[in-house]
């Protein structure tokens, strides 16, 4: 660290972990819990929607009702379109108006649209699905705002020794949300099964689809509003990271504003986002964060959104004609829950505990490589694994989830919150996250089209393409740099050699006064 660094820029860098750090992790993390639940719970009930609204008794193949491919892709993918637009809009707004002012808006949108998604009524299948897609777009819009705002707020609260772990801990709540998406659907479908038993489709095509299932999918979607609703009050109580008056109020300290030095600091660092100086300093990093997140989400969302179609090949669920509608929801949800609990969830927390020891760069590099390796094995040996070794298939498949989360799914969220200057940090994180959601849309609208009919050759080709995609992510990781153990200003070059830093002055200050510095600098 430069010895002439502004005293105010020590902000949170040398501070010990305090209670408000933990509070911020929980509050921001509950947003990601809600995000993950809302985005992934639809996969547990999408086949039920097909049985309820698209069963054709005149179908000569005598198959259960199934959402047509374009409609299935849109039902599952429309929230991702909303997420992409929400990331760009709220990321920009967070830099213009401040993080706190728009942080509550995203939560309100998520609550209202989660409830309205479950109230999607109509006189025809088309009107029900159309209304559902409308509200899920705006649900995704609110979810999108949470990505840049939560990451930016957490990075600006934390000290440099724990910053990566804190941001990763917020993001790790996504894993808990995915688990609960499977768990809630599993519990509710089991209750409905006990109350409304029915024969398998192959035994009775009509009565195998319980009409009460129409309540099940609505309840599953509406429950996504609860965690967001419970944290709204606390989110509004969080201090703004920008104005020092808020942080001073929280920490009960008086702030040394150092106005002259701050004026010099701001003069040096006021170049805009769309400028030659920005691209000279940060252009490669922005390309790196956008490309790696884009490539990662093609694979990650393809896995998560299409796993319901791969579960039969792994022997984790029965084929559709062998079960009734509610039983299919139960088996799909149970399989999602098991994969998330054993594969997805541990990966997030390995990252939290090791990110400050190993570093972001190595975790991301190894994660991409291992994902590519396991998918390559699955793709090459698909027929053998499907027919002769389903447990090995399930293990390899679970390991791809583990290394996605103990790997690029976590680090692509952390790095954009650290690499860029304060005044454009939220916008740059939003651009990176939006690139990721563009990749997720490829997973939802393109890859899912290959897996929907459960054709072995198509699934095999899709997995091999994803293996190649992960290897491209491995290569693009070299465009970013390690941020472990460095302050945000040092990483982004914001200190710029302006001002000076007195060890004795800082050591004589109360801890809270040192912590408040970055808030004033911002």
Regions flagged by a language model, labelled:
Residues 1-522:
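Transmembrane-helix signature of 12-pass secondary carriers
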């Amino acid at each position: 660290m430069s010895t002439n660094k502004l005293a105010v820029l020590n902000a949170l860098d040398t501070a010990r972990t305090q209670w408000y750090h933990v509070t911020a992790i929980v509050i921001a993390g509950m947003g990601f819990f809600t995000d993950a639940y809302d985005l992934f719970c639809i996969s547990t009930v999408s086949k039920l929607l097909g049985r309820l609204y698209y069963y054709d008794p005149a179908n000569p193949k005598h198959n259960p009702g199934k959402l047509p491919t374009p409609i299935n892709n849109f039902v599952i993918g429309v929230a991702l379109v909303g997420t992409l637009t929400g990331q760009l809009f709220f990321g920009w707004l967070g830099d213009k108006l401040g993080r706190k002012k728009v942080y509550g808006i995203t939560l309100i949108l998520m609550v209202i649209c989660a409830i309205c998604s479950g109230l999607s009524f109509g006189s025809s299948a088309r009107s029900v699905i159309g209304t559902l897609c409308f509200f899920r777009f705006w649900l995704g819009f609110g979810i999108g705002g949470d990505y840049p705002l939560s990451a930016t707020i957490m990075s600006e609260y934390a000290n440099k020794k724990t910053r990566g772990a804190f941001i990763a801990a917020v993001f790790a709540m996504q894993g808990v949300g995915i688990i609960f998406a499977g768990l809630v659907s599993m519990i509710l479908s089991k209750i409905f099964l006990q109350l409304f038993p029915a024969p398998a489709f192959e035994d009775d095509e009509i009565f195998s689809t319980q009409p009460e299932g129409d309540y099940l999918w609505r309840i599953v979607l509406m429950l996504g509003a609860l965690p967001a609703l419970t944290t709204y009050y606390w989110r509004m109580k969080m201090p703004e990271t920008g104005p020092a008056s808020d942080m001073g109020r929280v920490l009960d300290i008086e702030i040394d504003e150092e106005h002259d030095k701050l004026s010099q600091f701001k003069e040096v660092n006021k170049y805009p986002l769309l400028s030659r100086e920005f691209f000279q300093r940060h252009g490669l990093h922005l390309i790196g964060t956008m490309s790696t997140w884009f490539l990662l989400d093609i694979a990650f969302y393809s896995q998560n959104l299409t796993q319901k179609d791969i579960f039969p090949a792994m022997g984790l669920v029965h084929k559709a004609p062998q079960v009734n509608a509610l039983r299919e929801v139960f088996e799909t949800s149970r399989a999602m829950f098991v994969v998330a609990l054993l594969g997805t969830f541990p990966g997030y927390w390995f990252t939290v505990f090791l990110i400050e020891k190993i570093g972001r760069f190595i975790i991301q590099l190894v994660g991409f490589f291992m994902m590519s390796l396991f998918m390559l094995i699955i793709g090459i040996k698909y027929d053998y694994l499907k027919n002769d070794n389903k447990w090995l298939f399930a293990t390899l498949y679970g390991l791809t989830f583990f290394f996605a989360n103990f790997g690029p799914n976590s680090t692509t969220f952390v790095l954009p919150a650290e690499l860029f200057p304060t005044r454009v940090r939220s916008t740059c994180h939003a651009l990176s996250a939006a690139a990721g959601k563009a990749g997720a849309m490829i997973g939802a609208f393109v890859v899912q089209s290959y897996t929907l009919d459960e054709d072995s050759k198509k699934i095999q080709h899709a997995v091999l393409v994803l293996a190649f995609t992960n290897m491209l992510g491995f290569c693009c990781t070299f465009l970013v740099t390690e941020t472990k153990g460095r302050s945000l200003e040092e990483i982004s070059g914001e200190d710029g050699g302006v001002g000076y830093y007195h060890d004795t002055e800082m050591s004589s200050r109360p801890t809270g006064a040192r912590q408040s510095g970055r808030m004033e600098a911002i």
